[in-house]
Swiss-Prot record:
PROSITE patterns listed in its UniProt record: MARVEL
Protein name in UniProt: CKLF-like MARVEL transmembrane domain-containing protein 4
Taxonomic path: Eukaryota, Metazoa, Chordata, Craniata, Vertebrata
Gene: CMTM4
Domain MARVEL: 49-176
PANTHER family, alphabetized: CKLF-LIKE MARVEL TRANSMEMBRANE DOMAIN-CONTAINING PROTEIN 4, MARVEL-CONTAINING POTENTIAL LIPID RAFT-ASSOCIATED PROTEIN
Keyword terms, alphabetized: Membrane, Phosphoprotein, Transmembrane, Transmembrane helix
């Protein structure tokens, strides 16, 4: 009998020990959702955006900015060089920023960061790039030394200016539509909430009861304080 009891006790201790070690083991099955562990595995290209006007303009802007940057980089000698350096900075910056936005929009990465107003970001980028490309192209054309690379850079600079200007116009329209849609959604939400309150009189009665209770408590509190002070003086 004692050996049976000792065996049962040993099995109980072993099971409890295995439970404790299993609970403290770092190799526990995680409860993290599969969608979060996938990371960038769920990315997919959006062909509708690339086929649309904004997508095509983005692709054209990236290509034109890259060609303008390559043309300006082939110039070996310049005097003065300020206009060349400015055009080089504008073309490189426009290529990088527009390329990043193209990747964000074509892969729907902007949907994962809703805290940023992407329509406004695109509007600022296109407007600023159009203005800077226009100024840089004018300056480079004024300081042109009749070199083939400079002439090509000026031509592609003005083409990039036109592409960014058209995109700015479309981005302004899209931004206005998004602002109007947001205001309309807020108005509909407010109207729905007011109708819910009107259709449920118990909510109004509850609000009225809580308001009357607060008023009653406020009216009674000075009397209670006076009676308490009178009792303390007595």
């Amino acid at each position: 009998m004692r050996s049976g009891e000792e065996l049962d006790g040993f099995e109980g201790e072993a099971s409890s020990t295995s439970m404790i070690s299993g609970a403290s083991s770092p190799y526990q099955p995680t409860t993290e959702p599969v969608s979060q562990r996938r990371g960038l595995a769920g990315l997919r290209c959006d062909p509708d955006y690339l086929r649309g006007a904004l997508g095509r303009l983005k692709v054209a802007q990236v290509i034109l900015a890259l060609i303008a940057f390559i043309c300006i980089e082939t110039i070996m000698a310049c005097s003065p060089c300020e206009g060349l350096y400015f055009f080089e900075f504008v073309s490189c910056s426009a290529f990088v920023v527009t390329g990043v936005l193209l990747i964000m929009f074509s892969l729907n990465l902007h949907m994962r960061i809703p805290q940023i107003n992407w329509n406004l970001t695109d509007l600022v980028n296109t407007g600023l790039s159009a203005f800077l490309f226009f100024i840089a192209s004018i300056v480079l054309a004024a300081l042109n030394h009749r070199a083939g690379a400079e002439i090509a850079a000026v031509i592609f600079g003005f083409l990039a200016t036109a592409a960014y200007a058209v995109n700015t116009f479309l981005a302004v329209q899209k931004w206005r539509v998004s602002v109007r849609q947001q205001s309309t959604n807020d108005y509909i939400r407010a109207r729905t909430e007011s109708r819910d309150v009107d259709s449920r009189p118990e909510i109004q009665r509850l609000d009225t009861f809580s308001y009357s209770t607060n008023v009653t408590v406020r009216k009674k509190s000075p009397t209670n304080l006076l009676s308490l002070n009178h009792w303390q003086l007595a």
